[in-house]
Amino acid sequence: MSSITLRAATSADLDRITEIYADAVTNGTASYELDPPSRIEMGARFDSLVAGGFPYLVAEKDGIVLGYAYAGAFRPRPAYRFVVEDSVYVAPDAKGQGVGLLLMQGLIEAAKAAGFRQIIAVIGDGRPDSASVRLHEKLGFHHSGRLEGSGYKHGRWLDTVFMQLPINGGASVPPDPQSLPERKFRKQK
């Protein structure tokens, strides 16, 4: 039996990524979208993230994508350039196999390598027993806020939980002028 491997996502993965996300939108509360985006829309989102230098990973086993994770800009304002927001989605039949943990571990390492300083998790339906909250806690994220009743999906109000993981010294040291976020910022000026 082969093991689960991580690699950078490519456009060839977009059909499966779209399928996994459609299930999360339709059946879950991790995303506050109500209608699954098309393959074309998912491709545009993918292209934008990759062009921005953000990490986008897939986990696969025997050539089948089991899940994906990416980091994107937390907010568009330039002072936030060292902060990314993570997203991780696992196919329904791959849940409980450690796929989310493996993806997040890889994503954290990729965000560190790029020079980011904080990873923010914005978790829909952030109940304390939710798989996403438990996963982020296991990885060292701490709770940094809750927006009560901030989303309405599947006939109920949902809380949004914010969790945070400082990396590369967080806010305790000045940013590295050679980091990806700083180089992109200087190029835009």
Predicted regions mapped to residue ranges:
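Conserved catalytic-core motifs of GNAT/GCN5-like acyltransferases
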Residues: 70, 122-124, 137-158
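Conserved acetyl-CoA-binding loop-helix of GNAT-fold acetyltransferases
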Residues: 96-112, 134, 138
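A short beta-loop-alpha structural element at the N-terminal edge
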Residues: 5-17
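C-terminal "cap" of GNAT-fold acetyltransferases
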Residues: 149-189
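Acetyl-CoA-dependent GNAT
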Residues: 36-93, 104-105, 110, 166-167
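Conserved beta-strand-loop-alpha-helix junction that forms the acyl-donor binding cleft
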Residues: 95, 121-133
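Conserved GNAT-fold acetyl-CoA-binding loop/helix
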Residues: 18-45
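Conserved GNAT acetyl-CoA-binding A-motif
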Residues: 111-124
